[in-house]
Amino acid sequence: MYRLLERTLDRFTGLVEYQPTYPFAAPTWVYLVGAILIQQLATRWYRYYKSWVNVPVVGGHGIIGSWIAAFRWTARARSLVNEGYQKYGDFAFQVSTPTRWEVFICNDEMVREYRNFTDERFSANALFEAKYTVPGAAEGVHKVPVPIVAKALTWQRTRAATKTDPYFEEFVKELQHAFDAETKFENEDWNDLCCFATGTRIVAHLTAKSLVGYPLSRDTELIDLFAEYGNAVPTSGFFIAMFPQILKPFAAKFCSAPKISARLDRIVMDELRKREANPRSEPQVQDITDWITFWSRTYPGTYTDQDIARSVVSAVFGAIHTTTQVLVHCLTDLAIRPEYIHPLREEVETILNRDDQQWTKEGLESMEKLDSFVKECQRFNPLDAGSLARRATKDFTFSKGLHIPEGTFVFTPNSPVLFDEKHYPDAQQFDGYRFYRLGRVTGRPLEYKFIAANLKYLQFGDGRHICPGRFMAADEIRLLLAHILVNYDIRPKDDGERPPNWTFKKILFPDMKGMVQLKRRSINISQPN
């Protein structure tokens, strides 16, 4: 039997050479496969007991039961998380996956405690194998501290909100350039728009404008790499995570994310050398790269060009991946729900008329219905079944007595909460004005903005680890939708049907090839002066 298998492998892979056999002997590959199976069984047994947490189990108990649950996880992860939330939503539960146990914290008091832990206690870097995929954010390496990147983004947000600063106007022009460059519509009739591919590249342009500025924001090679990197990090991370620690460096060599990261590092370092040769004064700081460079000068000899480049590149994944997902859902949901088009367009045009046809940050923030529509699209199509994803870097015990061993992966439920009738009445129904009404009824509109977070809306995280780039993401999505509403009519491509979402483990993705159709309107008031 093994000889037949050997010949089959030899024919299809060319990796196994024929070896003469002897009584009680077997080819080397048989021993290798056996050793790998034993190693995997031993690893499974070790992980099962090491990361066991004393909370209810969803899907299966024991070694065999947890294996069955792990296979179920690949196809039905979101339903397993929902099952756990429905049964144990007042405390916590755990589910077995093919590589580990995952613990979900549901109790509000524990979530409040958990959301403010530092990276020294709970870290997010293991989720996408950051050591290999996002070196600028990895643990145990010399790097620009992550909070510094967050401060740089805050500086840029302040620029966007300052009326005398040209940054926001430049950002709008970059968006319009990116839209025209990436769509290339050839006629005035209906044109197909691939939401994911085009959306990814437009977001890549805007991310480049924010991080490295003009003219790199229009460099084709850089935009290609930004767009590829946003999708390469999670896929590479998932692949590397399947291997034991000793084999992860080897597995990483076959992944695209480390290679793209290295190429981006070189591009940013080349740009840094150009800027060093022609230094700018501090008032002329134009982008995140400039800001971090000036910050690093307060610590002479501490940070190299590679450290700065890696910190810039580490922001690319978060800036592109989630933003693009939400943007695609917004485009497809708008196309299949024409009842929202006129009211949203009217809101945008009213504010543009008020502001003399100028796009302003203040005007964008006044588009409350548009903001609500975007947030409802995100709620109705939640990217992940879990949120606040972290790995325990040391043993920890919550104030309620729950003990979390080192190495345990911890989450809070996300999609089950967003469809819980206790928190969102008529949760199964799409309501684009849901958050607009909540803001009006409560008199606290800021609490229901797209960028706002609370215990029942954790899609951007919360507490110490809330996403610092969510403001830029919100600007990109709302500006692009507003631009389309004013300049184009929109409709679904295929007989009114929405391109279907699909899932992989806990993650929900839009149809990567899904399309809508756009047709230019006769009135165009979107171009800035």
From Swiss-Prot:
GO biological process: secondary metabolic process
Keyword vocabulary terms for this entry: Heme, Iron, Membrane, Metal-binding, Monooxygenase, Oxidoreductase, Transmembrane, Transmembrane helix
Cofactor(s) recorded in Swiss-Prot or TrEMBL: heme
Subcellular location: Membrane
Regulation: induction: The onset of expression occurs at 48-hour-old stationary cultures.
Chain ranges passing through the membrane: 22-42, 51-71
Example of a GO cellular component annotation carried by this entry: membrane
Pathway note: Secondary metabolite biosynthesis
Main subcellular localisation: membrane
Top EC group: oxidoreductase
The organism's place on the tree of life at top rank: Eukaryota
Membrane topology per record: Multi-pass membrane protein
UniProt keyword Heme, yes or no: yes
GO molecular function list: heme binding; iron ion binding; monooxygenase activity; oxidoreductase activity, acting on paired donors, with incorporation or reduction of molecular oxygen
The enzyme's E.C. designation: 1.-.-.-
Listed PROSITE patterns: CYTOCHROME_P450
Binding site for heme: 467
Record family assignment: Belongs to the cytochrome P450 family.
Function comment: Cytochrome P450 monooxygenase; part of the ATM2 gene cluster that mediates the biosynthesis of aflatrem, a tremorgenic mycotoxin with acute neurotoxic effects. Synthesis of geranylgeranyl diphosphate (GGPP) by AtmG (a GGPP synthase) precedes condensation of GGPP with indole 3-glycerol phosphate, followed by epoxidation and cyclization by AtmM (a FAD-dependent monooxygenase) and AtmC (a prenyltransferase) to produce paspaline. AtmB is also essential for paspaline production, but its exact role has not been identified yet.
Protein name: Cytochrome P450 monooxygenase atmQ
Organism in which the protein naturally occurs: Aspergillus flavus
Gene behind the chain: atmQ
